[in-house]
A protein has these predicted regions:
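N-terminal phosphate/diphosphate-binding loop that engages ATP/GTP or pyrophosphate donors
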Residues: 1-27
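Small-molecule kinase domains that catalyze NTP-dependent phosphoryl transfer to phosphate-bearing small molecules
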Residues: 4-6, 49-55, 63, 68, ...
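A ubiquitous short alpha-helical element
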Residues: 14, 75-79, 134
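ATP-dependent NMP and nucleoside kinases share a basic, alpha-helical "lid"
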Residues: 20, 25-29, 36, 40-97
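Charged/polar, solvent-exposed surface patches and flexible loops
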Residues: 30, 47, 92, 108, ...
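A short, mixed-charge helix-start or loop-turn motif at secondary-structure junctions
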Residues: 30-31, 130
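C-terminal alpha-helix
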Residues: 147-155
Length: 155
């Protein structure tokens, strides 16, 4: 796995192939949750994420970035939305890519992943004490971006 920057955007390359679309699929999302409970996997990823952050200005998203990976980050935002809204967004993303999916199943999967991640032994999903809570359930993507840019400018 390699992380590269192409045309100003971060790309995740697996065996030299750009797999950004693949890593955002529901299947990978669930596999991520299942494999993140293994200490050796978490340790390696923790090292890689911290190495990336030390060498670059980064914006990272993830379920334990503010509490475990980068606990001293300059700005931490606990970005959330209701399970139904996240399911709707994922459904629309998949539809745009031509992927058939079931909205109700996506929501069930999101709820199951949340439960699993909140209750895992190692680095459970939780808001960092110094993170800004931002519920985006009733916000458009443009509103979310505007809010985050405002928070960055204030930091």
């Amino acid at each position: 796995m390699t992380i590269a920057y192409q045309e100003g955007e971060q790309q995740v390359l697996l065996n030299g192939e750009n797999d950004n679309a693949f890593i955002r699929t529901e299947e990978v999302s669930m596999m991520t949750s299942n494999t993140s409970k293994y200490p050796a996997v978490r340790e390696k990823l923790l090292y890689l994420q911290r190495e990336l952050a030390a060498a670059n200005n980064v914006i990272m998203d993830g379920r334990d970035i503010g509490t475990c990976v980068l606990p001293d980050a300059e700005l931490k935002i606990y970005l959330t939305a209701s399970a139904s809204e996240r399911a709707k967004r994922r459904y629309l993303e998949q539809k745009e890519r031509g992927v058939e999916s079931d909205l109700a199943q996506i929501e069930r999967d999101i709820i199951a992943r949340d439960e699993q991640d909140m209750n895992r032994e190692i680095a459970p999903l939780k808001q960092a004490e110094d993170a800004i809570y931002l519920d985006t359930s009733d916000m458009t993507i443009e509103e979310v971006v505007t809010k985050i840019v405002s928070l960055v400018q204030k930091a």
